[in-house]
Regions:
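Conserved phosphate-binding loops in N-terminal lobes of ATP-dependent enzymes
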Residues: 2-63
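Active-site glycine-centered loops adjacent to acidic/histidine catalytic or metal-binding residues
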Residues: 10, 102, 128
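Glycine/GP-enriched mid-protein hinge/lid loop-to-helix segment characteristic of carbohydrate kinases
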Residues: 19-23, 39, 98, 113-176
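Hydrophobic "anchor" residues
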Residues: 27, 72, 141-142
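Residue-level detector of high-confidence beta-strand sites
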Residues: 30-32, 75, 144
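Glycine-rich phosphate-binding loop and adjoining helix at the ATP-binding site
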Residues: 36-47, 55-59, 65-121, 162
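Short glycine-rich anion-binding loops that position phosphate/pyrophosphate groups of nucleotides
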Residues: 64-67, 128-130
């Protein structure tokens, strides 16, 4: 079987981590850079990362915030991500591009190759610059009607109608 390489980019509030993985999930190479917290600077960083690699079979992004139809909404701890659609931006590369919430990506990765391998029902919680999570039920990633099921960063912390105390905005494992 021919080895195919994929670029995986983890967008975080502190760092952007990236790796080349083969189709078996083995890391071929990886690195990280400090996150820039404005849209223009951030997109320049992503452009430079992608420009390093040729012959990719696909690119996967995981990011905080709501992700629906490969578009990031709200951006969680990185609000400047709101509205970014990597498929539109990198369409000329002619490779599949996937975008997923970072908490959901963590549970999928653990279920594929990690400590939750092959479990039909499992959950993961991520602690970083923000909080995140994902849930797998009956072997399927739980998405929900608003594409945010299992993302603990969007959990309300009070019963007020308007709640500015949402877990992902108020708490950070980095700050603990």
């Amino acid at each position: 079987m021919k080895t195919e390489n994929y670029l995986c980019i983890d967008i975080g509030g502190t760092n952007i981590k990236y790796a080349i993985l083969n189709n078996a999930g083995n890391i071929i190479q990886n690195d990280k850079i400090k996150s820039i917290h404005n849209k223009k600077g951030f997109l320049n960083q992503i452009d430079k990362i992608i420009d390093q690699f040729k012959g990719l079979k696909g690119i996967a992004f995981c990011a905080p915030g709501k992700v629906q139809d490969n578009t990031i909404y709200f951006g969680g701890s990185l609000p400047f991500l709101d509205g970014i659609n990597f498929n539109n931006r990198y369409n000329e590369l002619k490779v599949p591009i996937a975008v997923i919430n970072d908490g959901k990506a963590s549970v999928l990765a653990e279920n594929w190759l990690g400590s939750l391998k092959d479990l039909d029902n499992c959950a993961a919680i991520t602690l970083g610059t923000g909080l995140g999570g994902g849930i797998i039920v009956n072997g399927r990633l739980l998405s929900g009607v608003h594409a945010q099921a299992g993302e603990v960063s969007f959990m309300k912390l009070t019963d007020q109608k308007y709640d500015d105390k949402i877990a992902g905005l108020q708490y950070s494992a980095v700050q603990m």
